[in-house]
């Protein structure tokens, strides 16, 4: 790497830091019956944020066993801030390293679904309820996920009508449906043997659940896209060696058949796990960032505003 490239990266880091206002992590389950003190939501609010500022809950990947909070968490949040978008990095529950190297969940429950979806629903609730505090638009709250986090992001839209918080006695006064979703090299299917990412399936379902046909089907997202699914942005690289791009093709097909507004971008090169990095992936795959901002401003948010306007008109007629 030459000196110019070093200087460019250094200046980029300084610029991103200047735009970002990282706040202390929030323990999202404090004061509730849920025992999950390690689940946190870290706000990154751009300087000068206004009430119209969109917000994105960021779900890092890691096969539902661990989380890449540096590249697919903090790095993404700081980049979003540089675009004037508020970000909230979610450290959701995962199976853990011991579940990866052993089979202890044959004997104890451990962490598995619906823990993860419960975490993201709670996060959407808290972000919307705290919109005034963070100077964000509560009607422009999306979820962005990478790899297994992409599965969680799409699941947050797919199962938004199911209140996973109700067993805890939590009745949100706001919607837990995201207004838009971005899925980067996502895990999608848990049933299609051609494309399934087995480690992620084991992470979210557990030792017994990974063999349960009904449970696997229930979280194969391509089979359960709802009619009211919000707009979706998808990116996958053809040379991804970790999660087959067939996952995104299945999702694209399902969204198309349901006539859900979405954009699916296929890159020839880029691999996996590049997040918003300036050095990982390829020059081609790094263009997803500009594509996402354009899609958000020109496609997703206008659709969100139109939907909100129609809902407000219905309320006025009542």
Task: Please name every model-derived segment.
Residues 52-61:
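Short beta-strand element of the alpha/beta-hydrolase
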Residues 21-50:
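N-terminal cap/lid segment of alpha/beta-hydrolase-fold proteins
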Residues 109-132, 287-290:
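Alpha/beta-hydrolase active-site loop
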Residues 228, 233-236, 240:
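Short beta-strand/loop motif that positions the catalytic acidic residue
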Residues 31, 170, 186-224, 230:
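Mobile cap/lid helix-loop segments that gate and shape the active-site cleft of serine hydrolases
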Residues 122-196, 216:
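Primarily recognizes the serine-hydrolase "nucleophile elbow" in alpha/beta-hydrolase
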Residues 42-44, 100-105, 235, 245-318:
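C-terminal catalytic histidine-bearing segment of alpha/beta-hydrolase fold enzymes
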Residues 64-72, 91-115, 192-201, 276-278:
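Cap/lid segment of the alpha/beta-hydrolase catalytic domain
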């Amino acid at each position: 790497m030459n000196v110019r490239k070093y200087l460019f990266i250094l200046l980029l880091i300084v610029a991103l830091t200047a735009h970002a206002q990282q706040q202390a992590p929030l323990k999202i389950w404090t004061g509730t019956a849920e025992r999950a003190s390690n689940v946190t939501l870290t706000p990154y609010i751009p300087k000068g944020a206004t009430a119209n500022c969109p917000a994105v809950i960021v779900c890092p990947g890691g096969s539902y066993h661990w989380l890449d909070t540096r590249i697919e968490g903090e790095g993404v949040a700081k980049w979003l801030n540089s675009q004037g978008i508020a970000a909230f990095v979610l450290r959701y529950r995962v199976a853990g390293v011991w579940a990866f190297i052993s089979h202890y969940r044959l004997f104890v429950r451990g962490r598995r679904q619906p823990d993860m979806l419960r975490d993201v629903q709670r996060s959407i609730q808290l972000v919307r309820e705290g919109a005034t505090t963070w100077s964000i638009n509560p009607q422009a709250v999306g979820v962005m996920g990478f790899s297994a986090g992409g599965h969680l992001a799409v699941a947050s839209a797919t199962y938004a009508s199911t209140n996973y918080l109700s067993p805890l006695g939590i009745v949100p006064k706001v919607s837990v449906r995201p207004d838009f979703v971005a899925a980067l090299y996502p895990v999608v299917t848990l049933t299609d043997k051609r494309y399934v990412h087995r480690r992620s399936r084991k992470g979210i379902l557990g030792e017994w659940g990974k063999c349960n046909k009904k449970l696997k089907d229930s979280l194969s997202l391509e089979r359960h896209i709802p009619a009211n699914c919000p707009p979706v942005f998808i990116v996958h690289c053809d040379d991804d060696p970790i999660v087959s791009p067939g996952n995104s093709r299945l999702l694209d097909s399902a969204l198309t058949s349901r006539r859900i507004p979405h954009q699916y971008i296929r890159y020839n090169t880029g691999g996996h796990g590049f997040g918003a990095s300036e050095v990982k992936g390829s020059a081609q795959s790094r263009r997803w960032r500009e594509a996402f901002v354009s899609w958000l401003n020109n496609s997703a948010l206008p659709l969100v505003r139109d939907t909100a306007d129609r809902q407000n008109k219905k309320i006025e007629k009542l």
